[in-house]
Amino acid sequence: MKTIEQKIEQCRKWQKAARERAIARQREKLADPVWRESQYQKMRDTLDRRIAKQKERPPASKTRKSAVKIKSRGLKGRTPTAEERRIANALGALPCIACYMHGVISNEVSLHHIAGRTAPGCHKKQLPLCRWHHQHAAPAEVREKYPWLVPVHADGVVGGKKEFTLLNKSEMELLADAYEMANIMH
């Protein structure tokens, strides 16, 4: 009976042999002048069809509309400054600040903007939150075990800023804790 290592090694040998066969077939095909000529002919035919199609098409109108300048970036907010980007990178490297407060470390975070995305300095006010603290409600059985695991953005009837603040800390208190953990002077 083969061990797992032997099976893995056998599988690797089969893969290597298959790869070498495929490479040999490809080299053989590329060396065949008949195949190469057929590929060149296929390319020429495609170009001829494309040119004929362009000639059949009516000419474009002479007037061109000028590009309309986009006035709003929508929900994207404004571009962060270099300092805001530095702070956001430092905060993004932290674990979820709300989980950390309860002794749990969640390294997969998204940054939650406390003060919108367009105000001056708004990108300095971001909290590193896990998905359950940011905008998705944890499953009911998980919330039974961890009642403080509610999202800051309400997900249906679960969560919201008020409930989040009651079960954790205020966003500004969490921001101060995050700045302290990241050694950011504010």
From Swiss-Prot:
Residue ranges with Basic residues bias: 62-76
Region (Disordered) residue spans: 45-81
Alphabetical list of InterPro entries matching this protein: RecA_dep_nuc
Any one Gene Ontology molecular-function term assigned to this protein's record: enzyme activator activity
GO BP terms: DNA recombination; DNA repair
Swiss-Prot/TrEMBL keywords: DNA excision, DNA recombination
Ranges of compositional bias, category Basic and acidic residues: 45-59
Functional summary from the UniProt entry: Stimulates microhomologous recombination. Enhances the recA-dependent precise excision of an IS1 element inserted within the E.coli galT gene.
Protein name: Recombination enhancement function protein
Organism encoding this protein: Escherichia phage P1
